[in-house]
Amino acid sequence: MKVVEIFDSIQGEGEYMGTMCTFVRFAGCNLSCPFCDEAKKYGKAKEMTIEKIVKKCEQKIVVLTGGEPTIQPQLEELVKALQAAHHHVHLETNGTNDIDYFIEWITVSPKAPKYECKCLYNEVKLVVSEDLTLEQALAHTCGQLVWLQPCDGPWLEQSKKTILKWIEKYPDLFRAGIQLHKYYNAR
């Protein structure tokens, strides 16, 4: 499997924010989002066996992230091996690939309105940028809680104002999120 890094840190986003986890970051993605810096930011991947990955996971919760984890051919086998080792598996995905096996928690972060979500999920995380409209955000609710996170960069202040406005208008559909790990200077 193509792994960029494995590390322990607090979950900085969503329902499990503040929980200690082991993160397994995979390389590669099936999308080509213009704003993505995944390859530049995280560097080169190394091939790792499922056994080596499982051995490096020390926390109860293991978060599979990326890039896009669902493009890894052996993902289902890794999930089952982690579960057999008594880990709770969480997946962070763009949602464009089918998942037909059990994962304890799935967070979908759709990257553009043109991509259709093909998996069942527990929560949605949307980065509120100048390109995201309220109508697009509402289309992702589908009965699940949607976490709205501000966009870093020059649009940050406007992003925070937009989030507050949307939550005020739809308090049962949206929650404000942050990247808590950045606040604590954690990875």
Name every feature range the model reports, one short phrase each.
Residues M1-K44, K182-R187:
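N-terminal [4Fe-4S]-dependent radical SAM core
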Residues E5, M20-C21, S32-I103:
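Conserved Radical SAM active-site core
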Residues V4-I10, G14, P34, K60-V63, ...:
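Generic alpha-helix detector with strongest preference for long hydrophobic helices that associate
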Residues I71-R187:
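Conserved AdoMet/S-adenosylmethionine-binding subsite of the radical SAM
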